[in-house]
Curated annotation (Swiss-Prot):
NCBIfam families documented for this protein: PRK00099.1-1
Protein name (record): Large ribosomal subunit protein uL10
General function of this protein: Forms part of the ribosomal stalk, playing a central role in the interaction of the ribosome with GTP-bound translation factors.
GO molecular function, one term: structural constituent of ribosome
Protein family: Belongs to the universal ribosomal protein uL10 family.
Any single GO CC term annotated in Swiss-Prot or TrEMBL for this entry: large ribosomal subunit
Gene this chain is encoded by: rplJ
Pfam families: Ribosomal_L10
Source species of the chain: Dehalococcoides mccartyi (strain ATCC BAA-2266 / KCTC 15142 / 195)
PANTHER family: 39S RIBOSOMAL PROTEIN L10, MITOCHONDRIAL
HAMAP family from the UniProt entry: Ribosomal_uL10
Amino acid sequence: MVKKIREKKKIAVDELTDALAVAQSAVFTDYRGISTSELTTIRMKLREAGVGYRVLKNTLARRAADNTDHANIKSAFEGPVAMAYSSSDVVAPAKVLMDYLAGSKSTLKVTGGYLSNKLISVEEVAELAKLPSREVLISKVLAGMQSPIAGLAMVLNGPARGLAVVLQARMKQLEG
């Protein structure tokens, strides 16, 4: 019996270690007073955005943090803690949770977050949530890069277009 419990805890630590290792960012929440249906709704919204959400056992979470290069986040694991994390979009966990909290009367509390190998405050999580998503930022950069190229193409085509107009006018002059 004790072996099975230890085995389950080891599996839980390994899974959490993997989650922490790939997480680009994380938001920590205090889920006291949350009903199961509300927690399910939160999980569903996070999952739709590609964000994982785990309720953590603090001791196991600290062990998992020790197994990664994120050992500095151990202080976040106090009280009832759940973690929303993403391996692809840094903004998504903060944005989804803050949008949910703004549109509901939930008792869920954001207690802090993790970004770029450091803990961030609740205020910094709120600021992070205001940033556009990764896809929007990439499209803005690409649009900014495309504008000068399009302008250059227009400038380079200008003399050729002018020459074509002059030649066409000369042809009409010779015909008529």
